[in-house]
Each structure stands twice: as C-alpha cells, then as structure tokens.
Amino acid sequence: MRTAPETSEKPEARRPLIVCGMHRSGTSLLASLLAAAGLRLGDELLEASAGNPRGHFEDLGILEFHRTVLVANGIVSEGYTTQPVIAVPEAMQREAEALVATRQSGGGSWGWKEPRTTLFLDFWSGLLPDARYLLVFRRPWEVVDSLFHRNETTFRHNPAFAIDVWTHYNRALLDFARRHPEATLVCEATQVITDTERLFDALAAKFGLSLGKPAAHYDETLFHEDLSPSLPVLLEAACPASYDLYLELRELAGSTSPLPDGRAAGRGPLDLRGHVFTEWGRATQHMLRCHEAERRTAALDKRLMKIEATRGERWLRLLRRVRPRGAA
C-alpha cells in the first residue's frame, strides 16, 4: 500500500473504517490487528470457527443485514455471487440507518469488518459519505484453494465458480477504489503480514486514524501458503483476466511481494505443458493415497469386527462358568 500525503483533517471518531475484501483474503487477520490496536468493531461479534479459530471479528448486526438482503435477492447468504446489481429493499435501508446510528453513538474510533460489504460498497458509501475503507485482496489461487479446503457445496459442484466469485469481488473492490481514491486504502494480504506497522502508518497519514501499535500475534499456521507452484501458472493460463486483475490490484497497493516463479509483471511464456502434467501426477498420487487409506480402513474394520466377535464369545463362556447351579 502506498502511503498517501498527510491530510490536515483531524481524526473524527464518527467516521467509520470499513474493512472488506473477498472471503478467505485475510480480512479476519486484519480486523484482529485493528481491534487489538483500539478500533471498535462491534459489541456482538461472530464466534470463532474451525476456519477462523481466533475469531471472525464480524459485527453480527451488519452480517445479518447483508445476509438478509442477499437472500431477498435470491443469492446464498454466504455471498457467493457474480450478480452485478443487488437491490436493498426500502425497509432494509431504514434498518441500515438504525445500525449505523447505534454504532456511532458508542464513542471512539469505530468500524466493521465483513467480506460481504464488498458487494454493497456503493450502498454504504451513499449512507456513510465520510466513511473510510480498508480494502484487502489476496492471490486468487490461494483464495480458490482455501475455498476448496472448506468443502462447501457451492464450489464442490461447480469448482470454476470460485474464481468467478474472486474476480467479481475484486473487480468491485478495484472499481470502488478508483472512483473513491480519497476514501480508500488498498493492501495485499501479504502486506498485512509483512508490513503491518507501515499499514498502520498509512492509515494515520491518509485518514488521520490514530490507533495503538499493532499486536504481534500473527500465527503463520493459520495463513499458510504451502501450495503447488503450478497453481498460479495454470490459473493465469485458464483465467488471464483474473490474473491481470490481480496485477492491477498489486500496482494500486504498491505491493512488492514476489510473483510466482519470480516473474515480473511483464510475464514471459508459460511452460503450461509441464505444469499440466505436474498437477496430473499430483492428482494421481492423491487418488492412490485415498485408495490406500480406504483399503487400510476396510482391513481395520474387518479386524475390529473379528475382535468384537471373539470378545462376545469369551463373555458368553465366562457367563456359563459363573452361572449358579440349577439355574435355567
């Protein structure tokens, strides 16, 4: 993220900081750092889960508002969609106004984090013209892989939809940032991890947002990137528009993290043939391991049944020995 020139505007607690980005893009990590530094993200937050054991840091009121509007538009509540227009019913607009009024009255620097906000950026911008936005993105192949690991029905039946959703969210993010440069700060997930202090400095310089120092409690095991080097190459070949969108976001954020295979933005020819067969081989090895695991499980089940049968026979013999004489 490029640090903008310092603003003469004093910090205003009534101006919220809204954190959003595509699901599985590091928004929870970013929100946890902001909350630890003093940003009030809500009184009732979504509980931790297996996917986010340290917490989601999502305001339940804002979350339920987004879910309700999505369902009203015929979209799954998770927000997995590429629908270009999402209408907010009039009654829900009044609910949004009430949500904002309640949170503004709490005092201190406030805001919220909720990935689905990305689908409603124009709506919230109209309702909160002074809001500030911290927009985070993550490498598309990492997000897609993370979604697959969650084993959700949406992507299990249509895997390619995962990259479509990533593209839809991040296109909305990029378009909004370009239309509202004074109100937005864009960063890559890797910058949140490696340049946390610089990110906080940028927030202070651009938005006048004064927070405490970021807490150093990042757990690398919760944000691993141990993926096949073939994935970004295959994604670039199959979905060049999505890869180019990622490069545009990197440029806007001033990200300097290494690109796959050490290639610069001006990419060279792809060794697609080698990567296709690499992934084919990996998939075959995975299938063989699954078959071996199934074989071992079946053998263990058979052995367990035999043990249980033997145990039953032993108990029956024991009962016969201790049965009182004369008993029927």
Task: Indicate where each model-derived feature is located.
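PAPS-dependent sulfotransferase catalytic domain
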Residues: 75, 97-213
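Boundary detector for helix-to-coil junctions that initiate low-complexity/charged tails
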Residues: 252-328
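PAPS-dependent sulfotransferase catalytic core
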Residues: 1-94, 219, 295-297, 302
